């Protein structure tokens, strides 16, 4: 279910304040955040945000195609190592 338009996008206050500070200082340093639930807004374009995936911070460079999505969508939390193959086929 989508969020109501009248409410606007959800962004944590501490994250938006860090974004505004980075824009003011024109800093290219990654902004570290644990807020995977925050929506990407147009002010974040061309910034690098390091999103926590449960283990470490994954740097995500924000482009215009990402606007409207959540930060957590771009930092995978699970690593897929691949299914084990058929052992008989490997031996031949």
Swiss-Prot record:
Q: Which GO terms describe its molecular function?
A: rRNA binding; structural constituent of ribosome
- Please indicate which superkingdom the organism of origin belongs to: Bacteria
What processes in GO biological process is this protein linked to? ribosomal small subunit assembly; translation
- Name the keywords, alphabetized: Ribonucleoprotein, Ribosomal protein, RNA-binding, rRNA-binding
Q: Which InterPro entries match?
A: Ribosomal_uS19, Ribosomal_uS19_bac-type, Ribosomal_uS19_CS, Ribosomal_uS19_SF
User: Briefly, what is this protein's role?
Assistant: Protein S19 forms a complex with S13 that binds strongly to the 16S ribosomal RNA.
Mind telling me what this protein is named?
Answer: Small ribosomal subunit protein uS19
Instruction: Write down the species.
Output: Legionella pneumophila (strain Corby)
Which gene is transcribed and translated to give this protein? rpsS
């Amino acid at each position: 279910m989508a969020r109501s338009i009248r409410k606007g996008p959800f962004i944590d206050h501490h994250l938006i304040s860090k974004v505004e500070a980075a824009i003011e200082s024109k800093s290219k340093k990654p902004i570290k955040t644990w807020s995977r639930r925050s929506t990407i807004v147009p002010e974040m374009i061309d910034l690098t945000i390091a999103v926590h995936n449960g283990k470490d911070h994954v740097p995500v460079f924000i482009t215009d195609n990402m606007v409207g999505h959540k930060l957590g969508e771009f930092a995978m939390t699970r690593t897929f190592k691949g299914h084990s193959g058929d052992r008989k086929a490997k031996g031949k």
